[in-house]
Amino acid sequence: MDYKKKVAAALAPALNEYLTDTEIYEKIEIPKESKMGDYAFPTFTLAKVLRKAPQMIASELVEKIDQDQFEKVEVAGPYINFFLDKTAFGAEVLGTVLSQKAEYGQNDDGNQGNVPIDMSSPNIAKPISMGHLRSTVIGNSLSLIMSKNGYNPIKINHLGDWGTQFGKLITAYKLWGSEEEVKADPINKLLEYYVRFHKEDQEKPELDDIARDWFKKLEDGDEEAMNLWQWFREESLKSFKQIYDKLGITFDSYKGEAFYNDKMDEIVQILEDKGLLKESQGAQVVDLEKYNLNPALIKKTDGATLYITRDLAAALYRYRTYDFNQSLYVVGAEQTNHFKQLKAVLKEMGFDWSDDVHHIPFGLITLNGKKLSTRSGRVVLLDEVLNDAVSLAKKQINDKNPDLANADTVAKEVGVGAVIFHDLKNERTNSFDFNLEDVVRFEGETGPYVQYSRARAESILRKAGDVEEFAQLNITDPKAWDTLKALQDFPNIVKRAAAQYEPSVIAKYALGLAKAFNKYYANSKILADDEEKTARLALVKSVSIVLEESLRLLGVKAPDEM
């Protein structure tokens, strides 16, 4: 149902002497104004070849085109404008959406290729803050979008579960902790112990020595140290999963930093065998000058391996385990240089698949204009933001629809959905400000607006009663045109979102479809008893299907009533 292909096919017999089918297809444009047609073909590039003015070329070409399948084809200066047969177009679009339902837009471009997605990745024993929101929801949406495009996504939560801080945490727990306290409130208690350690070691520097000893024990596999570390990890994960449940997000793997402890020696060995390690001020580095990058630090002067060594081990493990088509890292833009180095070192190691490793960077969130920063003490907990969003949604639902039966469930879907949608409607690399009241509004460019539009469609269908068969799909009302065109575009939008790794493509599309539908609703008598009633209801049903699927691809629920 690619109408651009129909236009290209109509042009091909007259143009194949000069342009390939692909070149014709790529030159076809969608005019900004509908009075200029639904598709337009510019003739500028043919002027050199044919040595004629573009206007003359357009006039001659239009005579050679089979116009039967279009409402009309006309010349406007150097352009040939194509107007689709709106009734036939509408019937085909509605028929396709209604028959395919949630499968509409599904394609097999990915050929079931594996796509590991490194996302979320909070630190054990620390709370999930608003700073973790972006990686978590962008990664989740990308997994849904990649799946819609025929890939097999694997969501990996690469936990921050290793490092010298665990020596400090074990020391603090042994001195001041209790099992009951940790079980009752894992994250807050473990964080409290950690903060206390840093206060006390100002006056008792010997605490640092004890902490170093405990981390050494942990590295050596000491039973008590390992048991405490494992327990801290498990208790933290229980807390994390409560927040992931609220967001409606699951993971395929929680293999974090610790998992790669025994896999880094192989990386160092490969680098040594290939003669890639160079000595620099006592440290071991890989020279990346030919990539215009700083040297990658592999081992410090004391022989300790570094962050990039662990990431190299993880990249190799993922390739061997998943034989991936592409491997994505949804990590903030501030890590761009790190991932450039990672790809370059993998390339130097002789791994051609390094070309399939992609950093998916994103911008920062500010809160009411201020940067979220742990160091300055502005830790804004994600759980609290989600709870506040749900409360705000509940208040608005009570004001709009006080008799709603399942108001608590809907408030959760709207509140949490609002936070996710606000993040994803912004282009990934852009930073944005977060103001909760703006985010949970039912009007404007918000998640609740899209959800409300879809609930409105469901409400119309309930009022119409059971419409099992949409026997008649021909809509002649020009007011339906924008909505029909938006529905037809959904499969292209799904492809574009995957190609650009950009959930905002879906979010902006959903807003556009919702606006087109609401305008149609305001200006049409959908339930009027005439020969086009079933076609209008078919349009409403199609809008409901595609809005629900658009929201699903963002990780947002679509309540039937609001």
From Swiss-Prot:
Localisation per UniProt entry: Cytoplasm
Top enzyme category: ligase
Keyword hit for Protein biosynthesis: yes
Enzyme Commission numbers on file: 6.1.1.19
'HIGH' region (motif): residue ranges: 122-132
Catalyzed reactions: tRNA(Arg) + L-arginine + ATP = L-arginyl-tRNA(Arg) + AMP + diphosphate
Residue ranges that the Swiss-Prot or TrEMBL entry lists as coiled coil: none
One of the record's GO molecular function terms: arginine-tRNA ligase activity
UniProt keyword list: Aminoacyl-tRNA synthetase, ATP-binding, Cytoplasm, Ligase, Nucleotide-binding, Protein biosynthesis
Gene Ontology terms: biological process: arginyl-tRNA aminoacylation
CC annotations in GO: cytoplasm
Family indicated by similarity: Belongs to the class-I aminoacyl-tRNA synthetase family.
Oligomer and partners: Monomer.
Protein's UniProt name: Arginine--tRNA ligase
Organism encoding this protein: Pediococcus pentosaceus (strain ATCC 25745 / CCUG 21536 / LMG 10740 / 183-1w)
Gene that encodes it: argS
